[in-house]
Amino acid sequence: MQTGNFKTRRSGLVLSSVEGFRNVKGSFRDGCKEVQFLRIVGMDGTALMETAAMDRSLTEQMGRGQGFYNRKNSLPKLAALEDVEFYSGAYRNWADSGKHSVSLKTPVQNQQLPHVISGACAEILGLLGQGKQGMNQSIEKNFIAKVLFWLDEIFSPALQAWKPDYVMKAVFANISKPQEYLFCYLLTLLGADVLLLQAKQDIPAELEGL
């Protein structure tokens, strides 16, 4: 994806372990951020130990101001009425802007980021609609509202500190729903490295090409 002078590309480096994901740092040159989108199916004892070590190491680095890290076992539910109203309004504002800029609860310092997020939302919305029967504005609104909510809930510190070469890593467990998987993909479009630990569930085959 490319938005303005910021773009991302999938790293050609092949990783197969949690430790490899922890240690990798993609390059940034000529406005292009190299990112990882890694999926590990099954968790053995080694992977569990490497995950614990990753939590310690990357949390310590974040505490020293060296990038952002977050690991989640599940994505939060958009349920509170005030949140539903806010993010439904954020979707309408995004649509009214021609899908060029997006607003969140998180105060964003970098003026480029709302446009980067907007472009990423448009891309994953297009992917959601591929081959989907009955795609309509209501489905579109509910999806984008959830995505913006998840960004605020999970990624707020990273959004506040964001710059094109900022180091961000996010880890999620047992992602199997298309909308959740597309959110994880969106994070890579913002420049984050993303790891999916699929111990119990995995994505459907049609999503593997992303």
Each PLM stretch: what is its role?
Residues M1-G20, F28-V147, L207-L210:
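Conserved N-terminal ligand/cofactor-binding loop architecture of enzyme catalytic domains
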Residues G20-G31, I154-P164:
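Short boundary motifs at domain starts and secondary-structure transition points
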Residues F21-N23, A52-M54, P178-C184:
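Short alpha-helical segments and helix-capping/turn motifs at coil-helix boundaries
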Residues E123, L128-G209:
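Active-site and donor-binding regions of nucleotide-sugar-utilizing enzymes
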